[in-house]
Amino acid sequence: MSDNSTETQTETQAGGNGQAEAAGRQIVVHAQYIKDLSFENPNAPDILIDPPQQPDVQIGVNVGARGLNSEQYEVILSLSANAKTEDKALFLAELTYAAIVSAPGASRDDLNPLIMIEAPRLMFPFARAIISDMTRDGGFMPLSIQPIDFVAVYQSNIERQKEALASSETDGEA
């Protein structure tokens, strides 16, 4: 597969905006795959006979990455959907979806945002379709997860890392 494949995100018109320039850097997706997939339907078939009108659905999302070699990274997008009514669990869907990516020519400063923001953004439509199919195949209406702000997820992960580091430094001084 060449670096000019249709699976690359091409540079965008930056117009002098540094953030747009960073977002326009090239990222290559070499492979996408399911690492783990789980669907629990604990109250079937009873819940399917008389389904509730408006269940409470909680969506969880997390992003992680690890280096595979000097050029490639495995990006892991974890999605969970937990649906319940006041007294019954409807379903629990969990997906760990991964991709092998590289960012040729990216500077060290641009690499982390490309891996942790742009790669999950490219992976999300595929992961969302898997969750939707899984809930439909489980006997429920297909769950369509709304678009996710991966910049906010990235910033939240950085804040958690800073808090954990500060906490460990405080614990070490005591």
Regions found by a protein language model. Give the residues of each.
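N-terminal intrinsically disordered, cationic/polar leader segments
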Residues: 2-122, 128-174
